């Protein structure tokens, strides 16, 4: 039915008869389901530290991932906002990807545990995440983070949030340089659907009905959906887009979010941004984050490229025994 590579096809066979998130009986059940799928033992080479950040929108739990061999050294920062439909996801369910990025970039991965639906809706998690970003930049020395160029990254709705972080950083004059934006299948429009929603309406791991449920839950006020923060594809100005840093967008070819990711990349390119659009053939949504998929050859290659793009903006560090 879907053109998936063997690893993705095998995983699809395992999950195809299971309920989708919107069919699980509630927000907590959907959250618990992803936590179960993503159970993971902490990597022995990665230091994981949690801190509490923020007053107006916090306190927010923030997890810092870094190599244990570099724990006493100041490192550059990758600020990562996670996917999960604004409903699911945590530092635990995304740990395997965060550990890998920390290992491959030799940076500190800053992971805000923003407040999810139903406890908060738009724009609270965006403001909350920006409060964390602003704090980490202004108090970098307290957390062994290099003051200088940083990177933003995120997947799915976390990619949507990373775009918002970039927009807010420009508008609010965040006192740092953002040198790279890395996005996996970002949500870029929330008030209408592009063609891939029809083509992949019943795609594995993310369906049209699930996305409808997520958007309606996060953005219950339909007027909010036609704003720059909610739908940057159509409502973010050319003037702001032209100020975006080099951006790489990784997309799955079997994903309802495919077309809006391509379209957002094209808008960046038309505004002179060094933007790359990479389609991963035979991959379903979240193929780099899902534990059962991320060891496939395409996922490994994408993570390698993402880490390379991140590392090239940071000061180079020679650490024997760890991959570049």
From Swiss-Prot:
Transmembrane segments: none annotated. The keyword Cytoplasm does not apply. Disruption phenotype: Does not affect tolerance to benzoxazolinone. The active site is at residues 156, 255, 285. Keywords: Hydrolase. Gene3D superfamilies: alpha/beta hydrolase. SUPFAM superfamilies: alpha/beta-Hydrolases (SSF53474). Its EC number is 3.1.1.-. It comes from the Eukaryota. Induction: Expression is induced in response to 2-benzoxasolinone (BOA) exposure. Expression is also induced in response to 6-methoxy-2-benzoxazolinone (MBOA) and 2-aminophenol (2-AP) treatment. GO terms for molecular function: hydrolase activity. Belongs to the AB hydrolase 3 family. Esterase; part of the Fusarium detoxification of benzoxazolinone cluster involved in the degradation of benzoxazolinones produced by the host plant. Maize, wheat, and rye produce the 2 benzoxazinone phytoanticipins 2,4-dihy-droxy-7-methoxy-1,4-benzoxazin-3-one (DIMBOA) and 2,4-dihydroxy-1,4-benzoxazin-3-one (DIBOA) that, due to their inherent instability once released, spontaneously degrade to the more stable corresponding benzoxazolinones, 6-methoxy-2-benzoxazolinone (MBOA) and 2-benzoxazolinone (BOA), respectively. PANTHER family: AB HYDROLASE SUPERFAMILY PROTEIN C4A8.06C, ALPHA_BETA HYDROLASE FOLD-3 DOMAIN-CONTAINING PROTEIN-RELATED. This is Esterase FPSE_08126. It comes from Fusarium pseudograminearum (strain CS3096) (Wheat and barley crown-rot fungus).
């Amino acid at each position: 039915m879907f053109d998936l590579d063997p690893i993705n096809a095998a995983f699809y066979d395992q999950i195809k008869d299971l309920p989708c998130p919107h069919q699980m009986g509630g927000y907590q059940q959907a959250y618990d389901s992803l936590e179960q799928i993503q159970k993971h033992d902490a990597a022995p080479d990665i230091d994981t530290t949690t801190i509490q950040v923020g007053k107006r929108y916090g306190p927010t739990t923030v997890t810092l991932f870094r190599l244990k061999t570099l724990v006493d050294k100041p490192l550059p920062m990758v600020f990562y906002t996670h996917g999960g439909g604004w409903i699911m996801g945590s530092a635990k369910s995304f740990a395997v990807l965060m550990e890998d990025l920390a290992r491959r970039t030799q940076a500190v991965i800053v992971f805000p545990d923003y407040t999810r639906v139903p406890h908060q809706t738009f724009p609270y998690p965006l403001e909350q995440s920006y409060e964390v970003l602003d704090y980490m930049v202004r108090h970098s020395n307290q957390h062994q983070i290099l003051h200088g160029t940083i990177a933003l990254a995120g997947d799915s709705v976390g990619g949507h949030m990373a775009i918002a972080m970039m927009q807010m950083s420009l508008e609010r004059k965040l006192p740092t340089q953002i040198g790279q934006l890395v996005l996996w299948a970002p949500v870029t429009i929330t008030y209408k659907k592009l063609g891939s929603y029809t083509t992949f309406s019943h795609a594995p791991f993310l369906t049209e009905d699930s996305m409808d449920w997520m958007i309606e839950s996060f953005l219950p006020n339909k007027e909010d959906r036609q704003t720059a923060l909610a739908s940057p594809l159509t409502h973010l100005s050319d003037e702001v887009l032209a100020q975006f840093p080099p951006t790489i967008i990784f997309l799955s070819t079997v994903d309802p979010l495919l077309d809006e990711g391509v379209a957002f990349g094209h808008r960046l390119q038309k505004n002179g941004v060094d933007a790359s659009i990479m389609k991963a053939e035979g991959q379903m949504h979240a193929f780099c984050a899902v534990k059962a998929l991320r060891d496939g050859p395409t996922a490994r290659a994408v993570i390698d490229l993402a880490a390379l793009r991140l590392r090239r903006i940071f000061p180079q560090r020679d650490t024997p025994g760890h991959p570049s």
